Regions:
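N-terminal low-complexity, intrinsically disordered segments
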Residues: 1-5
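C-terminal accessory/tail domains of diverse enzymes
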Residues: 7-18, 30-326
Length: 326
């Protein structure tokens, strides 16, 4: 049951509708000491990230949220009864509920709140493995963690015999073009570097609930959302990006040693999107509305919109430059 510009209420016998949720996932390998700062920063950024990158306004022919994928994924995998919801049982698709001071906070929440779906037990004794100088694979922890669908998820893994932690950012949809997706990644990684290294971190100046409200508001309204930001109050995404976040993203990419011309190219895409207010979702909605005003019914308008989308996608021109009237 998703209510946006229109409302869609359907019942499914499986999680098959979730297969419509195509995402872009960004990973950052960090040290244990740096993990909480980077995860908290990623949570702060989820709202602005999604407002800029929304690209999923239609589902089953209905105009719903700017990024319908967020609510569709949440509802399609939610098996809680009303009674369990009233008791405070957490959904497995989860934003979280607090800032963290250690990666253990998240793994402890996994155990505390979410029952095991796949009770497979490995033969490994992690403590014995450590005592012998080996690297434990922690198969049970990794399997269980993979059944908790946080929008920013902790990842423990072993690669080439070395253990590491990653922040897995699952906020963004795929598309519309490769250049848009690279720009989204540059914006995210630049801001993550700057915000996570601040002496007075942003997450100490705002409630966790405000970050979650930003995330849901951005999913619902995209570039028309109102986002809370410390020191600014409620602002529109374009104002937040153009006046505050773009310089921070540029500085973060500089710290990552990204060349100035590369920073300019991809952050220029973000700037153009913020100035025009046209992300993938806005273009799709405006195009369908224009086609319907020309006399097409909704199915025909969606079909024609998709044809144009595919054509423009292969051009690799950023979505903020796409023409609506063509």
């Amino acid at each position: 049951d998703i209510a946006g510009a229109e409302r869609l209420s359907i019942q499914a016998e499986s999680i098959a509708p979730e297969s419509a949720c195509t995402s872009m996932q960004l990973h950052l390998q960090v040290s244990p000491a740096d993990f909480p700062g980077n995860w908290n920063a990623a949570q702060v950024l989820a709202g602005p990230q999604l407002a800029l990158g929304a690209n999923s306004p239609y589902f089953f022919g209905h105009e719903l949220w700017a990024e319908t994928r967020i609510e569709l994924f949440a509802q399609a995998t939610d098996t809680r009864t009303d009674e369990l919801k009233a008791q405070g049982v957490r959904p497995r698709v989860w934003f979280g509920e607090r800032w963290i001071s250690s990666v253990f906070d998240l793994f402890e929440e996994n155990v505390r709140y979410f029952p095991t779906l796949l009770p497979e037990i490995s033969d490994e004794d992690p403590l014995a493995e450590l005592a012998a100088g080996g690297i434990p694979r922690l198969s049970e922890l990794r399997l269980h963690n993979g059944t908790v669908y946080r929008w920013n998820r902790p990842v423990y893994d072993v690669a080439n015999g070395r253990p590491h932690l990653r922040v897995e950012n699952r906020v963004l949809p795929a598309g519309p073009t490769v250049v848009d997706m690279v720009a989204n990644a540059a914006f995210y990684y630049g801001l993550l570097r700057t915000i996570s290294e601040e002496d007075q971190p942003l997450w100490t100046k705002m409630s966790f609930a405000a970050a979650q409200d930003n995330f849901i508001g951005a999913a619902q309204h995209g570039m028309a959302a109102r986002l809370y930001w410390p020191g600014l109050g409620e602002v529109t995404p374009d104002e937040l990006v153009l006046r505050h976040l773009l310089p921070m993203a540029d500085e973060g990419l500089r710290r990552w040693r990204v060349a100035p011309e590369v920073r300019d190219r991809y952050l220029g895409v973000i700037e153009g999107r913020a100035k025009t207010g046209q992300n993938g979702s806005a273009w799709q909605v405006a195009t369908v509305h224009a086609l319907q005003e020309q006399g097409l019914d909704r199915p025909a308008a969606l079909t024609e919109m998709l044809r144009r989308y595919c054509e423009l996608m292969h051009s690799n021109a950023p979505v903020h430059t796409w023409d609506i009237g063509r």
